[in-house]
Amino acid sequence: MFRGKGQQQVSSTDNIKAMMTAAIGNKLEKRLPLVSTIFVVGNDEEEFNIERRTLWQDVLPDLQNLAFQSNFDLEFCDVPLENGELTNSVAEHVLQMWKDNPRSWIVLLLGNRYGNVSVPTSLRKEEYESIRSSIFEENGNVRVFEKAYTINRNGAVEEYRLVPSAIKDKKQLAEIIKALQAGAKAAHEEGSINQVHEQRQNRFFSSPLETFVRSILQVSPCRCLFLLRKFDQLVADPNSPNAFLETNDQNSRKIEDLKNEITLKMNDRVMTHVLRPESTDINYFFNSRDGDKYREKIARQFNEKLKNHLADINPPVRPEPPKSPMVLAANEARTHQEFLENQLALGNLKRDYDKRLDELASVKVNRGVFLIQGTDLCGKTQALCRLYHKISDKDAYKVIFFTNLTYSSNFAHEAWRTICLNICSISNIDPKEVLEHFKLGGILKSLEELVQKADKPVCIFIDDVHLLKFGHLLSQIGRRTETAPDNLSLFMTSSNVAPVNAVFAVTQTVNVDVISENEVVGMVQKMAEKVDKKLTNEQISAIRPLMAAKDGILIAKSFTHEILFNGNSSMKGGMDGRMTRIEKEFGKLAVGNAVKFIAASSHGLTRLEIHDAISADREVLEEMNMSIVYSLLTLDGIIEALGPILRKVIIDDRQIIGIAHSGLISWLRNRYLTSSQDIRSAHLQLSDLFADLLIDNEQSPRHEIAYQSFSQGIKRDNGSPNFRRLRLLWYHCLHSGNLDRLKELSLCHFEYVDYVTRYFGISHLLSLYEECATQILHHDLQVISEQVLVPALVTMARDSEQLAAEVIGRLRFTRHENSHFLNSLVDQAMSWVDLYNRQPLLVPLTCWISPPATKVCRSFTLKDWKPGNTVLTLSANHQYILISGNQSDPGVIYAYHIASEQLIGTFKGHTAAVTCLCSSNDSSLFVSTSFDKTVNVWVFSQSTPTMSLTHHTAKVTCAILTSDDQYLITASADSSAKMIKLETGEVMRSFNDHTGSVVSLQLTSNNQFLITGSGDFVVQMWDVTNGKCISRMGGLMAPVSTLAITSNDAFVVVACEDETLKVFSTVGGQELHELMGHEGKVNSLVCAQDDCQLFAATKSKVFCYDIHNGQMIDVLDTAQPFPICSLKISSDNYFLISPCGPKVTIWNVTKRNHDAHDVHADKEGFLTAVALSNDDKYAACGTNNGIVALWDLEVCQCVFTTIQNKGDPITCIRYSVDSQYCISGNQAGCILILDAQNGGVVRELFMHSSEVLSIMSLVHNKMISCDIQGKMVIWELFGDDDTPEMVATGVKPPIFVPPTGRIMVGHCSLSNKEMKIWAFPEEGPPVTRAKLSHSDEITCFATSPKGGNFIATGSRDMSLKIWQIDKGFLTQVLVGHENVVTCCCISFDERLVVSGARDEKIIVWNVQSGDMVCTVNTTAAITSLSMTGDSTVVFSTTEDGWVETWSTTKGRLLSTFNAHRPIKKLINSYESHRMLLLLENCAQLPILCLHNTPAVGVEATRRRSARAQSVSSASNEPVASTSAGEIKKDPILSSNNGGNAQSAPRATAPKPTFDMLERSKSRTSLIEKDRTTTLTQSNAPPPQKSNMCTLL
């Protein structure tokens, strides 16, 4: 019935161990990437136009869909389209690609034409000399033959290779063929080449098609589908060439013989079609009805046969299971191990550091951290790999890691976690400790523990450790000085010019010198040997001088590859020369487009992705003369020619083609992506590809051949995700600058985030946000990463299925403050839960988990900064800052990228300190003012000013730009302000009324009014259009230091030298109020765009005020002893940037509340009691300040609230048996009766003088209540007065009365070891029926929710006892716990009893036999237990805030939920579609739902719902609704019991969980006060109030 967590595990421990052992072993089985290529081969483009069109239009889309759904890439290569007439060189290229990939397939088209003879691509030396001699003897054209071939001495035997340029001219090609055939025939007749195989001899006279076919027929199994077409009874006119018919009789016989041979040998792979057109006009036939029938027939045949063949050569289609962390680590290990083997494949190259490596390999002696460093491309990686190889597996556990090799090898936290998990696997150590940690500090502590536990030394090898990134989310550890554990040897390579964070103190440093000439020669000779070739002495001599270059080793490898690939190399021009030759061979555009996409990608692309990205650009295709699609053969040739520039790695079963070295990426980007626009354009094209935006579903399938890109949908029909989209879409959206697409399609898209978490791990998901944080400063991404995902790590480590619950719970809490993208993420998470069916799932229906506050977003220290008066401005998109004030160089302006904290430029033009900086609204320019009396205008692309203005006669103090960036207003110590036209630098207007220095400027939003502040104690407002002063803001007692104006122009804030801070009305100029509480002089002011928050900067601190009421909201402390002279707020109103000395701090200022006020309010609203109605429709709760709230559980909203007694906590709450009334008791002894349907007060009783702890229903509308002093009162529910029916003492609460209302269970007041059962007769006082006892204190008791025959008691004596209620007989003593039993529950049918104890153990018992059904262990002491109505599921809550759901049959964990607070109590409905939690210190009512386990009713009165609760659409009207479900009577209850007269009506399960919930609802607090307004967004309506009654 249940699909528990056990089924989620992808592999058992043994399987993972085997996988890891294989990865760490000496030799790995070669993996084939999941890619199939279909080659369509025929004589030329025209002969099989109709068949090829059918393949393109009717077959390829279906095959692409099959491939996508089956998880393999499908490449389609139409050879005639790409290359025209078939030649031997093209045929050999196709054959080689076909043989290299066992998953490829050929569709071979043969018709009536035999094809033209082509020249061989190579001749053996003896063949060449014999033919040349014969041509000479026959007086043939020896010269044209000699020019066509050049000798290649690099093979095992010398041969002559065809020069490609020699056959480009058709006339010259005909002469070569004529001379070659004549020479070959003569040589054969003379006997000089008779020893050659007959087929080799015939190739001089055979068409490429025949040669190609015969090569295919020799391969077994033959992965080829033949279409044999014959036009019967048609004879071609010899004088009129025909694209479909052969004009040469001999060739006609050859093609017929060839087709007959194919039919005999490959009958099951042959499609034979004999067509009988009425004339030689074949095109007329194809346009006829018979032609349509032919086309439909071959389309069916192609579809059927190719689908079957592709299915045979590709793995069977299975849903991709989620990956466990251990499997992810094992997959990573395999990829790194395969790369290691490729590095070692060259063999043992002798280097001058070999002796040093031998010393390091003695791990029994050498322990510590060894740093191998050197220049780029000096062989550090090779040294590390050889060192790894030298250390035996018997002597140590070894793990090797290549930084940036895979998508999970970029960030330190992810890298070290993977390394630790790999160590666990190979050393058989339990990975539990590692799996619980995600932050680098905790991971490194786990590593130290692992190393100590290992029974052998642990050797870790990390390549390019300096490239590991340390993000601020999970990788912040600072500079560590700890020494490595004794059992650890850590070997790392690093550039000798880059800083290294080795995480442990470096023990030794090994320097790798630049590779010598002899070492390079040895390396390139090994390269040749690897492919069974050799280098001549002349070539080696030519390579030696290349080592003088900086990148000599790469040049040598590239030129060697060129020699081995082409047979020769000019060896000129270094790497640029090599690229130029490749461009000349394949076309500059063809090479440039392929390389730019590879260079733009993070780790590389598949060949299909490169092909599709280029094919989507129609303009580029036309420029390359490729009208339909980018040539796959050309692309393969380019990739092969690039050789050592590229590296190929198999990741996610795809071969990823990337740049081989980080140093090459910059070079290639500078060559092919020359501007930032080029880079963004490349990323945008790739984001289009992975967003699946290149698919044109409207494309007509009949009119023209057109290529549709391979699908990149997010998931397949079986639910498996598309790994390539998950890997790359976010990256290219980010770098294209399209942040809306980034959020909408990836990082704020729940399905995307969920898939990344499931298949790559949440640690990798956070790496994506880490990477974004190094590129952009963005609020939404920060919220998701820092306020949702990082706090959810503890939850996700325990239950990966809880991502949706965490997103819903945290982001719904702040729904009204969220952006559209964040709220969409919540909606998608709800919809995801709707469709979730993998296993039971706990989800929150209300929100109470507040996202953690992130006051400081980022801070960084400026290098070599001597603090002074630091001024700063922001770019329009708030990604860059311009800053000045470094006393070491006071006139210099520095530009920093905020996210990466990198200096990106300097601007020099001032001779004295800069006083102000301001940027244009489009970031095209910025303006600076200075003590040198100048105003400079700059553009970001130039380091010198474009304009320098000298209109002032004293220092220029500040400047401001109009909103249209057309005018600049400057202020100076010469007592004036001037308005300057930016385009010309001309002064348009002067403002000269001040008598002191003008120190601050502000403009109204319409640019009409200018506000100036001066040292003459005056603030003036000017009309910009005429330069006249229109008002003055007086009353100041000191010079003005700075000004600020709100964005709605309502208020002007003035700070003065006497430390005063005042708010003025802009309209009237009168002072409104003075702001108090700051310390010292205010140096800078800025108003947030919500027109409410004001930020005032003093020395080291920024004070935040509510500008409307003057209340101080927050204090931001930079902890630097310097004045803050500049404040800027981002255009999106999320971030405040403050420079203080050498430190720049970015603050999150989206909302500031007075914390003390909120804390007090929350404490008043803490819940103290909860109750669930018997029909499961309603809930009630009471708070610490005396509020009773009634909830409609169908919509999960509070519908009524009532104050019982203000300030007296509610201590108990209960519904009547018929669910019509809610009764609550409080600390003062008051009892309140509410009508549950309308919230109206029915009665208020004062029968107790102390805290009421229990209220229960009896028969005949009677109620019983019990207080903390043991006073028990029986009273009438509908009585006219407060006179109790009976008052008694001696009963200690809590008490319990079953729905029958005729007995009561309670504690004895005299002994905590005893309980009693009392019966209520028709007349008279209660009668003691039985006594229940333990040897120690009774800590808990339980009966069936409907009453029943048994009661269970738990005790400090660690036992559980089961008693008969009627007689008080002890039926079972259940012993199994090892600590105090804290809670217990009995199932509805009384078959099972469940107990929980402080020993962190839950035991399910059989009531009749007393046997243990199952036992489960938890992580903390159990606080409460409950069961579903059908007894199949038990819920447990723990002290550490977890709700866990267990199967009562097997004890399997079904689902968990983290409430993030200690849980006191859990109450669930019959089918657990609604669950109530009572948490410590929580002012909201947590309501949960359990999905996918509807209780199967054991009573006929219960009906199972059609499906579990959904989490989708919402009702906007939070009205109390009645269920439309069928209401049944409980046959157990009598029908004449007064208050209990109606049987507890139970409806069917509520409507789908979130169907009736209001999606726009944020948190619902149980107290809403009249608070003084703080922050209302000016551009959005104020947050909607809770639908509860407002309490004053």
Curated annotation (Swiss-Prot):
Alphabetized UniProt keyword annotations: Cell projection, Cytoplasm, Nucleus, Repeat, WD repeat
PROSITE patterns registered for this protein in UniProt: WD_REPEATS_1 (PS00678), WD_REPEATS_2 (PS50082), WD_REPEATS_REGION (PS50294)
Residue spans of biased composition, Basic and acidic residues class: 1556-1572
Tissue/organ expression: Expressed in the nerve ring, neurons of the lateral and ventral ganglia, including the sensory neuron ADL, neurons in the retrovesicular ganglion and two neurons in the lumbar ganglion, PVQ and the sensory neuron PHB. Expressed in ASH nociceptive chemosensory neurons. Not expressed in ASK sensory neurons.
Listed GO CC annotations: axon; cytosol; dendrite; neuronal cell body; nucleus; perikaryon
Residue ranges of WD repeats: 909-948, 951-992, 993-1032, 1035-1074, 1077-1117, 1119-1157, 1162-1201, 1205-1244, 1247-1285, 1287-1328, 1333-1373, 1376-1415, 1417-1456
Methyltransferase as UniProt keyword: no
Signal peptide boundaries: none
GO biological process: response to alkaloid
Domain of life according to the entry: Eukaryota
Region span, Disordered: 1507-1592
Keyword Iron-sulfur: no
Subcellular location field: Cytoplasm, Cytosol; Perikaryon; Nucleus; Cell projection, Dendrite
Polar residues compositional bias, start-end: 1533-1545, 1573-1592
Purpose: Involved in the avoidance response to the noxious chemicals and repellents such as quinine in ASH and ADL sensory neurons. In response to the noxious chemical quinine, promotes dauer formation induced by pheromones such as the ascaroside ascr#3 in ASH nociceptive neurons.
Name of the protein in its database record: Protein qui-1
UniProt organism field: Caenorhabditis elegans
